[in-house]
Amino acid sequence: VLQPGYPLLDDLQLWHIPADGDLRMLRSGDHLPLADRPVMVRNPWLPVQLEPGINQFLLRVDTTSTVSLPLHLVSWSTSASQQERLMLFNGSFYGVVFGLFFYNLFLFLSLRESSYFWYLVYNINMLLFIASFDGTLWLFGGPGGMLQSSIIYMLMFSHCIVATQFSRHFLHTATEFPQLERLLRAKMAIMAVFLVSLPVIGLHAYNTLASLAVLVSSIILLASGIHVWRSGFRYGSFYTLAWGLLLVSLIISTLNSLGLLVNVSAGTLWIKLGVSCELVLLSLGLADRIRALREERQQADEKALQAQLERDAQNRFLARMSHEIRTPLNGVMGMLQLLRDTPLNERQRHYLDTVNGPA
């Protein structure tokens, strides 16, 4: 079986010219429904049967996406062995993503924290993008044709928007970094315009623009995380490390697609590994930030309780002092009242009036 390792190729036509000259043609690609492909898998595989003698093959590729064409000609037994390992990796990836989604969904329902909501939206968007990028999404049916190709690029633009919105809440830019907040808001507005620009600029330009948008967006968000981290906020370290790992995986995948690395077939695997690490680190960062907020709230409550205890102690002290002062003073005033009722000469009465005067 001839295995093209890139599932986003629109249309592949393979002509097989065996030694007897009997021309045969096979067709596959993501524009064909799964039931119409020669092999019903997410990649556009083409089964071939080698006849004795010289076999010639002509392959024509027509696609609107990046032309990445890693080819492997393997036996069915070797292919089955490779698919076992690949299914294990893909199952682990989707298991991690779904596990993080439901874990953070539980936290969102418990805490009602907006950052968790936007993490869930980001998780879903990233899941749909990866599933469409590696062809898994279309195993369950797809529109086919140009619409299916454009959906992938729409998900790339929505990724830029949702990632920025999540970053605003995660990094607290509205309250801590007003200038960065304005930059991220402007970035979201620009990405929203790009998202709806397909009818104006066409699919080819839309494809190029989506790739550039993801690259520029990732760099801006990484720089934002570094700025927050350097400003002394601990959660910025989780954010920076998460986006750094994602960028490294994207760079490795790009180098693979350009043929600059030896293992040219592992590009999608690197992206999945980077996305998994990013989502895990962002989830840890959210948990750390919530824990830090709870510690700050607990410290504030302890300070408020301490201040209340000090006020209560001061009030008790004043009440005790007032009681201790008023008790002998009341005795003195009573004696003065008794003296007023006794016969006094003029001088004694003057002294008594002098004492009673301030009272």
Question: Language-model segments: which ranges?
Answer:
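Soluble non-transmembrane domains of integral membrane proteins
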Residues: V1-L88
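Carboxylate/His-rich catalytic cores and anion/metal-binding grooves
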Residues: D11, F117, L128-F129
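First transmembrane helix
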Residues: E84-F108, S211-H227
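Juxtamembrane interface at the cytosolic side of transmembrane helices
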Residues: F101-N123
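Interfacial "cap-and-anchor" motif at the non-cytosolic start of specific transmembrane alpha-helices
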Residues: L128-H169, T173-K303
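Residue-level marker of regulatory loop/turn positions in helix-turn-helix DNA-binding domains and
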Residues: F233, E310, L344
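Primarily the dimerization/phosphotransfer
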Residues: Q299-D341, H350-A359
